[in-house]
Structures are given as C-alpha cells and as structure tokens.
Swiss-Prot record:
Its main location: cytoplasm. GO terms for cellular component: cytoplasm. Pathway: Porphyrin-containing compound metabolism; protoheme biosynthesis; protoheme from protoporphyrin-IX: step 1/1. This is Ferrochelatase. One of its GO terms (biological process) is heme biosynthetic process. Belongs to the ferrochelatase family.
C-alpha cells in the first residue's frame, strides 16, 4: 500500500508588506475585493472602494501600521513566521508552509511549496479559532480556485475551526492567569472578538455562536464568575449594523459606570496585529481611561507561545 505524505498549510489573513500608503493600498484592495468580506453589489462597491475608501484610508492606516511595526516587519507576519518555524520543528518530518489569504506569501505559493515536497495530503489549518464565512470560507474559496487548474489534486483536510478545542482553551486560560498574577485580578475580563455584519449571522453564519462557545469554555476553565466576564465585538466597518455590543462603546460605558480595572483579551486573533496592538491596546485603552477607568491591560495573543504551538500540533496529528 502506497504511503501518504502529509503537509500542513498554515493560513492567516495577511498584512501589508510595508507601513506605506502604497503597500497598504495594494493590501486593502485585495482584501476588500473579496466577496466573502464585502458582498455589496460590484457596481456599487467598485466605485466606492477605488474612488473613496482606498484613497482616503490607505494613508491613515499606513500611519497606524507604522506605529506598531517591528524591526523584523509586520507583527502578524513576524508571529506567523515564528509559528510556522515552531510547528515545523514540533512536527519533524511533516512539511509546513505559511500562506496568507491576502498579500504575501500567497496561498498559491504555499500550496506549490508543499507540492514541490511531494505532499499528497494537505491539512489546512486556518488560524481563525471561530469559523466565519468571511475568513475560513474565504480560504476554501481560494483553494478551490487555485486547484481548479491542476490535473492531479492532492487530498485536503480542511479544519473548520477549533473554538472549543481543550488545548486552545487551556492556552487561553494560561495566558489570562499569567496576566492576573502580574497585574492583579481585574474588576472585569473583557473578551473582544472581531465583528462581522449582523446580516451575515442572520443569513446563517454561526460565527457569533462559536464566539459564545469559546467564551463559555474559557470562563469554565478559569473558574471565575460569569458576571466578571464580558464579550464584545470590534473593528466594525461601514454603516450597516454589526454584531453587538461594540467594544469601543462598551469601554466608554464601563468607565462611566465606575469600573476601574479591566483586562482585555482577543481570543479570535491567533497573532497580534493592527487590530489588537493598535485598536485594542491603544485606542480602546484611551477610551476607557478618558471615561473614568484607571487600570487597563491588554493580554497578548497566543502568538508563538509553546502552548499554542502544542495545540496546533495536536490538531494536525489528529488528521495525519
């Protein structure tokens, strides 16, 4: 019987290649052109994207990226590369290739890298703990497009998500506990997830339920009272309603209500990036403090923590 050689396609969203308006514009154009991300009719969306959004947002977003840029590059890329290297070391003889939904390295190049190593079974681990049509399904769409030109297809295992995986929950809980030990237990632990349009959920995307599942399991693992934990949604874009409660509005409300000490974690982000390091660690901290809060700590993403890499290995081993 012929043996099967498995390989891992490690996927994340992507990032601009430089903190410049031109690089950000290229990245945003690709990202915001995906129908899974924005499903507005093209005859409405194209003029708005090209004539208004890209020219206005690119310079502003480039400044934000510059404020968080690391010596090695974009934080998301730096941590993703570290994850790729650590997972490869943990798996030994199983090839691992990093691909981004948008930007470089592309999913196309990552798949080809695995095929060049004679892989005939690709395990797709998209680092989105909670499934959404705008993230995980977008990866599947792109993989279908890429492989449409192949005569010989590799077999693929697509891991839908891992919102309730015990190893994932344990890694989150360890991170929270370390923060509590370092800064003291806060009045409130706030779990901020990336938002999606409410309409997507109304049409069947189970993302909000998967976020609730993670929150429930994490609260149980921590052994703290449910009323000391709150779940919110961040990073809304555009005018239509998104999942609520909104993180920024909640920060203001908590400060005004007299909450003095909060700690914030973003369980849906596997690597720190603009949305965590700038939006949550900086912008929302300012909102909370200006509204009357006193202590605010952001709990970093799992990044390349050993427990995070061990979780990835456990998932991959299950499907080898």
């Amino acid at each position: 019987m012929q043996s099967v050689k498995s390989g891992v396609l490690l996927v994340n969203l992507g990032t601009p290649q430089a903190p410049t308006p031109a690089a950000v514009k290229r990245y945003l154009k690709q990202f915001l052109s995906d129908r899974r991300v924005v499903d507005v009719p093209r005859f409405i969306w194209w003029p708005l994207l090209r004539g208004v959004i890209l020219p206005l947002r690119s310079p502003r977003v480039a400044k934000l990226y510059k404020s968080i840029w690391m010596e090695e590059g974009s934080p998301l890329m730096v941590y993703s590369r570290r994850q790729e290297k650590a997972l490869s070391a943990a798996l030994g003889d199983v090839p691992v290739a990093l691909g981004m939904s948008y930007g470089q390295p592309s999913l196309d190049s990552a798949v080809q890298k695995l095929l060049d190593q004679h892989v005939d079974h690709i395990i797709v681990l998209a680092l989105y703990p909670q499934y959404s049509c705008s993230t995980v399904a977008a990866v599947w769409d792109e993989l279908a497009r890429i492989t449409a030109r192949y005569r010989k297809l590799p077999s693929m295992t697509l891991i839908r998500d891992y919102a309730c995986e015990p190893a994932y929950i344990s890694a989150l809980a360890q991170s929270v506990q370390r923060s509590f030990e370092k800064h003291g237990e806060p009045d409130l632990l706030l779990l901020s997830y990336h938002g999606i349009p409410q309409r997507y959920a109304d049409e069947g995307d189970d993302y909000p339920q998967r976020c609730r599942d993670t929150t429930r399991e994490l609260v149980s693992a921590l052994g703290i009272a449910p009323e000391k934990v709150m779940m919110t949604f961040q990073s809304r874009f555009g005018r239509e309603p998104w999942l609520t409660p909104y993180t920024d509005e909640t920060m203001k409300m908590l400060g005004e209500k007299g909450v003095k000490h909060i700690q914030v974690m973003c369980p849906g982000f596997s690597s720190d990036c603009l949305e965590t390091l700038e939006e949550i660690a900086e912008q929302n901290r300012e909102i909370f403090i200006e509204a009357g809060g006193e202590k605010y700590e952001y709990i970093p993403a799992l990044n390349d923590e050993p427990a995070h890499i061990a979780m990835m290995k456990e998932l991959v081993d299950r499907y080898r």
